[in-house]
């Protein structure tokens, strides 16, 4: 197909992440020439399956797997240079050209080893104090965003000025080592193998961190860019851009199940702020949602099933869907589709259309349940309340629909789906009020049903 020129699409997750955004971004880049990451860090994980080969990405936009597509890391991303180069080297070993196609905003805050140390120590302190863990990945994302908001972060651009970088690094280390040792008790904490080289007596050591940062600085310089300017110039030249969200709406720091959320805004509106373009450049918002729900880590999950019990629908979802986190390897909790939560996601993102992924995972279930609202304090509500405390008290209200025994794996024609699968999808559209434009029927990029293409949709 020939896409409309100068049209830009935003892809966002509508659940708690892990919806299959990577595959759809990869599929959509046949119509785009640039892909942009605008928030998060290497806590996000995208798995692509191309010709049967799996590739896991954490920082680099999924468009890197399409030859000739330019990839951008916007200012809204917190960047671990160490993890970035691990990813680059892995792709290069697989024959993928990265460095000439990757542009990194000079305004990206840096994730440094002390951020990960604080992240891990805080979660350990919560557990030791009897509180439920937030469920962070322990990769320093939250502490790095804290430094950004407190206006003390070291940014990519600082790497171009070694003396300034060193002075500010010393200041940051004094602050964060004080937090680690006096408040979090890091002197008695056993850090993992990845952090041990940086830490002595519970303190992160300046010399090791500084030397590594200076090595990364030389490697990063050719990729540093004014990403905002380049994206605006690309748009004026009629280039199609794709903005790739990480995690999901229900993990958004403002609109998610607070405090069990990430530290950035995962919603579509942040595609503008997190990359340096105006909101008028965002033409279509595609919401990605699984045909059921999953969640990694702590926090409320109204439709959660006994997914660890063999023979149950939740166990079927976990097993057939291979529900383990790309970044952490943790098992994902599984449950029925929550259309009420999706309505909230549609509201805060302004969704133009939906892509339903992993429809094939539901093959073989005799019946399906669809949450259309909740009961809270004796009243029926059709949207989730704000905040985890009230969501925990919500009881889901379900509709039961018949399942299907036929296989949907690899189907690329909507008319060839089982009748009950089509009814299930139609009911999701009716309850949420958002049209389904795409359906994924396996992890393979080509196993996609298209009803309306985001780059052609009006």
From Swiss-Prot:
**Which positions does UniProt annotate for substrate binding?**
326-332
Protein keywords: Cytoplasm, GTP-binding, Ligase, Magnesium, Metal-binding, Nucleotide-binding, Purine biosynthesis
Pathway(s) served? Purine metabolism; AMP biosynthesis via de novo pathway; AMP from IMP: step 1/2
> What's the main place this protein lives?
cytoplasm
Q: Where is the active site?
A: 18, 46
Complex formation: Homodimer.
Protein name listed in UniProt: Adenylosuccinate synthetase
Source species taxonomy? Bacteria, Pseudomonadati, Pseudomonadota, Betaproteobacteria, Burkholderiales
């Amino acid at each position: 197909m020939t896409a409309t020129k100068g049209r830009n699409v935003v892809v966002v997750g509508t659940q708690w992440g892990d919806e299959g955004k990577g595959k759809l971004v990869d599929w959509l880049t046949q119509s785009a020439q640039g892909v942009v990451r605008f928030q998060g860090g290497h806590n996000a994980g995208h798995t692509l399956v191309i010709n049967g080969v799996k590739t896991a990405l954490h920082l680099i936009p999924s468009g890197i797997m399409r030859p000739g597509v330019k990839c951008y890391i916007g200012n809204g991303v917190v960047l671990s240079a160490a993890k970035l180069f691990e990813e680059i080297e892995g792709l290069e070993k697989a024959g993928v050209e990265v460095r000439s196609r990757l542009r990194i905003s000079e305004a990206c805050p840096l994730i440094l080893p002390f951020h990960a140390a604080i992240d891990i120590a805080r979660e350990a302190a919560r557990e030791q104090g009897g509180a439920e863990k937030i469920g962070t990945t322990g990769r320093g994302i939250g502490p790095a965003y804290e430094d950004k908001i407190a206006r003390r972060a070291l940014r990519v651009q600082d790497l171009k000025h070694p003396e300034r970088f060193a002075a500010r690094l010393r200041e940051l280390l004094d602050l964060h080592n004080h937090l680690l040792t006096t408040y979090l008790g890091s002197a008695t904490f056993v850090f993992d193998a990845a952090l041990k080289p940086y830490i002595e007596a519970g303190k992160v050591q300046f010399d090791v961190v500084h030397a590594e940062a200076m090595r990364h600085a030389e490697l990063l310089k050719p990729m540093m860019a004014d990403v905002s300017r380049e994206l605006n110039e690309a748009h004026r030249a009629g280039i199609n851009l794709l903005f790739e969200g990480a995690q999901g709406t229900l993990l958004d720091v403002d609109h998610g199940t607070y405090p069990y959320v990430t530290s950035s805004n995962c919603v579509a509106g942040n595609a503008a702020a997190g990359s340096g373009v105006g909101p008028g450049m965002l033409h279509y918002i595609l919401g990605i949602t699984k045909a059921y729900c999953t969640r990694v880590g702590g926090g409320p999950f109204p439709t959660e099933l006994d997914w660890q019990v063999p023979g149950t629908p939740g166990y079927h979802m976990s097993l057939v869907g291979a529900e383990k986190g790309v970044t952490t390897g943790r098992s994902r909790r599984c449950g029925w589709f929550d259309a009420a939560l999706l309505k909230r996601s549609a509201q805060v993102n302004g969704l133009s259309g939906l892509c339903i992924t992993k429809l094939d995972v539901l093959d073989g279930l005799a019946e399906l349940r669809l949450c259309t609202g909740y009961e809270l304090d004796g009243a029926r509500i059709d949207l989730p309340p704000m905040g985890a405390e009230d969501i925990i008290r919500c009881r889901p209200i379900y509709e039961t629909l018949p399942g299907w025994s036929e296989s949907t794996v690899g189907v690329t024609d909507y008319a060839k789906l089982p009748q009950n699968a089509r009814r299930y999808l139609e009911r999701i559209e009716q309850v949420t009020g958002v049209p389904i434009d795409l359906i994924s029927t396996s992890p393979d990029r080509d196993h996609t049903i298209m009803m309306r293409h985001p780059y052609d949709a009006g």
